[in-house]
């Protein structure tokens, strides 16, 4: 084998080994891993690991026969199950399908995701009814979190969506949300958010 072929083979082997290691890290972590942390663990250059992540994402996300995919959120990567299999995963975990969000929670979540950061009082005004319990449910489900406080008397809490919200709805970032114009046929929702 020539020296050039030997080097190419060595590079391919190293690349495959690193992909395997990164795949293991994502699997074991269960949580999103920052690219800088992956680089530190595998002791490789940021750009090189970023390219490997892109290759891994293409492999996982491009193969419809796989039940898992790699998502990227705010500079982190996570191995997750594909949403098309959620019905079966719920059966395995014996989750109650009735754990869905109430109409009030869905309305509040829609307002928060399009108007964030926003206070509870502003949500109440848009909905026309109190939203405290709906917001509390969203916080419990880790779809919404306190993002700060408004600098006015009383310093009301500002709410915004979480990374869990993005994962739950298979979004990379808030820019992936459907345009509010798409909801104009459903005047109730668009009227609430546009107010």
From Swiss-Prot:
In Gene Ontology terms, what is a biological process of this protein?
Answer: chromosome separation
| GO CC terms in record | cytoplasm
Q: Which SUPFAM superfamilies does the entry link to? A: Winged helix' DNA-binding domain
Does the record bear Ribonucleoprotein in its keywords? no
UniProt keywords, alphabetically: Cell cycle, Cell division, Chromosome partition, Cytoplasm
> In which compartments does the protein localize?
Cytoplasm
Enumerate the Pfam families for this protein: SMC_ScpB
This protein's source sits in the domain of life called: Bacteria
Subunit info? Homodimer. Homodimerization may be required to stabilize the binding of ScpA to the Smc head domains. Component of a cohesin-like complex composed of ScpA, ScpB and the Smc homodimer, in which ScpA and ScpB bind to the head domain of Smc. The presence of the three proteins is required for the association of the complex with DNA.
Family stated for the protein in its record: Belongs to the ScpB family.
Name the job this protein performs: Participates in chromosomal partition during cell division. May act via the formation of a condensin-like complex containing Smc and ScpA that pull DNA away from mid-cell into both cell halves.
For this entry, the protein name equals Segregation and condensation protein B
Protein species of origin: Clostridium perfringens (strain SM101 / Type A)
For this protein's source organism, the top of the classification is: Bacteria, Bacillati, Bacillota, Clostridia, Eubacteriales
- Gene (UniProt): scpB
